[in-house]
């Protein structure tokens, strides 16, 4: 069996997503307390409490509940990220925090922004990973990945005739979006993807512009 066939016929690996969620909790623990909403341990604790039943429901085949729990986790992390970015923005003009602390915190929040929206894209594209596993369709319904732009008769040459994305592909979209302030690898098809991308770009732009301004002493 070819790699492309395995990519479409096997369920998407979930360990990558679990690792991303755990990484977000770890990043939040590393933030200074003045850049966190509530106690520093609160978000990581919520992640653990919700992640366990999310994994269990997936194993038990409770796909609707699993999808709902995944949405809740993403929503909580997103709200925490927005709250931390607001606190970061508020701390820059007053010059109360050390420049190095601000830069490190900004970098951590920028990375969190990438991971959070990668989770959203993975969770929502085509109805979610479980629905995508059932359909076993080529490509994506929300993004135009480069593999989808290859002519059908040429797909075998590049071993992508039965290709579909997994979490790493969504992570790359999120990374390039935050880095270039716009989608570069895969054009957007779905309106929800466009809305989320605008939110991601706004957050990334806020972090980068304000930190650069602080670094050069403009503010």
Question: For each predicted feature, which ranges?
Answer:
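Membrane-proximal soluble regions of multi-pass membrane proteins
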Residues: 126-185
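Cytoplasmic-side transmembrane-helix entry/capping segments in multi-pass membrane proteins
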Residues: 65-77
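Structural signature of hydrophobic alpha-helical transmembrane segments
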Residues: 16, 37-50
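Pore-domain transmembrane helices of cation channels
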Residues: 92-130, 135
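Pore domain of cation channels
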Residues: 164-219
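N-terminal membrane topogenic signal
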Residues: 5-20
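Short, hydrophobic transmembrane alpha-helix segments
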Residues: 28-41, 59-61
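C-terminal ends of transmembrane helices
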Residues: 4, 54-64
């Amino acid at each position: 069996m070819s790699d492309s066939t395995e990519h479409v016929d096997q369920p998407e690996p979930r360990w990558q997503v679990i690792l991303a969620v755990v990484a977000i909790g770890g990043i939040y623990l590393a933030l200074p307390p003045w850049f966190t909403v509530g106690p520093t341990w609160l978000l990581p604790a919520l992640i653990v409490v919700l992640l366990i039943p999310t994994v269990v429901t997936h194993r038990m085949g409770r796909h609707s509940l699993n999808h709902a729990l995944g949405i809740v986790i993403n929503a909580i992390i997103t709200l925490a990220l927005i709250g931390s970015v607001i606190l970061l923005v508020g701390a820059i003009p007053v010059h109360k925090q050390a420049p190095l602390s601000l830069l490190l915190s900004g970098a951590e929040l920028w990375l969190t922004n990438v991971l959070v929206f990668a989770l959203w894209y993975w969770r929502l594209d085509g109805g979610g990973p479980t629905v995508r596993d059932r359909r076993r369709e080529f490509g994506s319904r929300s993004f135009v990945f480069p593999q989808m732009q290859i002519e059908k008769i040429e797909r075998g040459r590049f071993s992508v005739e039965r290709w579909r994305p997994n979490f790493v592909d969504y992570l790359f979209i999120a990374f390039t979006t935050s880095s270039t302030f716009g989608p570069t690898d895969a054009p957007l098809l779905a309106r929800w993807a466009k809305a989320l991308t605008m939110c991601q770009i706004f957050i990334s732009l806020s972090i980068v512009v304000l930190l650069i301004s602080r670094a050069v002493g403009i503010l």
